[in-house]
Amino acid sequence: MTVHPVRPEFVPDPSLSQTEMEELQRDIAAAARFEDEMDVLPEAITRTGDAPDVDQTTLSTSADDRTEPPFIAGVDQAFVDDKAVSAIVVLQNGEVIERVSAVERTEIPYIPGLLSFREGGAILAAFAELETDPDVVLVDGSGRIHFREAGLATHIGVTLDVPAVGVAKNLLCGTPEQSLDERYPEGTRIPITADDSVETCPDGTVIGHALQTRQYDSPNRHINPLIVSPGHRVSASTAADIVEATADGYKLPEPTRLADSYADEAKATVE
């Protein structure tokens, strides 16, 4: 099985003008569903090999309901000159079951808010190599926390119609309900709400969270929180649940941490 676009009209096209890209993002945001429509219970997603303590591992009511643990994919990129190297690592119960990568030439420079048009081609090419159908995808990048609610995780999630979560290191837009410059204990969640910088969403809407997945023991040092937002078919609260459940003593959730490492490994083979 390979994962191909369900909405080919949303495949990133770097030849579009910036105005056309932004208009496409508005269409993607309109198609995105920022609510839980996954085929697995969030409680079934764990960072270790322990079996989930839930009665059912699926939400589906179809006759062929699956009871096996969910497949969680992490996506990250590396760059070599004008080439993007996209890596996907799939885990099940904390074990790596598949790794794929793809290399595509980047056609445009980095433009804030238009990352998917620079990196999306390589990501979709990597998904085309994937034999596993992931239940949820964690993407290194923004989801709904975006000027038009269509960050990289949303663009990929909607195009493939797969539940997706954006995991970013920096806040692109929106207003946190508390300062992100303070030191917070592990597990702290700070809602990020839409403001005037988010043109497609009413002010005050919770579009994601700052999530403290790890913190130093020493009060004199601190680790900044991750910026977590729903990409597609996942709510803001569940997106944070998933990232927290898959963090394994590191700041990054295990799927994207391993994808980051594999992207660097794959990068070394690019000529």
From Swiss-Prot:
Keywords: Cytoplasm, DNA damage, DNA repair, Endonuclease, Hydrolase, Magnesium, Metal-binding, Nuclease. Its cofactor is Mg(2+). One of its GO terms (molecular function) is RNA endonuclease activity, producing 5'-phosphomonoesters. GO terms for cellular component: cytoplasm. It catalyses: Endonucleolytic cleavage at apurinic or apyrimidinic sites to products with a 5'-phosphate. It is found in: Cytoplasm. It is an enzyme of class 3 (hydrolase). GO terms for biological process: DNA repair. The keyword Nuclease applies. Residues 46-67 are annotated as: Disordered. This is Endonuclease V. Mg(2+) binds at residues 76, 140. Belongs to the endonuclease V family. DNA repair enzyme involved in the repair of deaminated bases. Selectively cleaves double-stranded DNA at the second phosphodiester bond 3' to a deoxyinosine leaving behind the intact lesion on the nicked DNA. It comes from the Archaea. The record marks 110 as: Interaction with target DNA. The keyword Electron transport does not apply. The gene is nfi. InterPro entries: Endonuclease-V. It comes from Haloarcula marismortui (strain ATCC 43049 / DSM 3752 / JCM 8966 / VKM B-1809) (Halobacterium marismortui). Its EC number is 3.1.21.7.
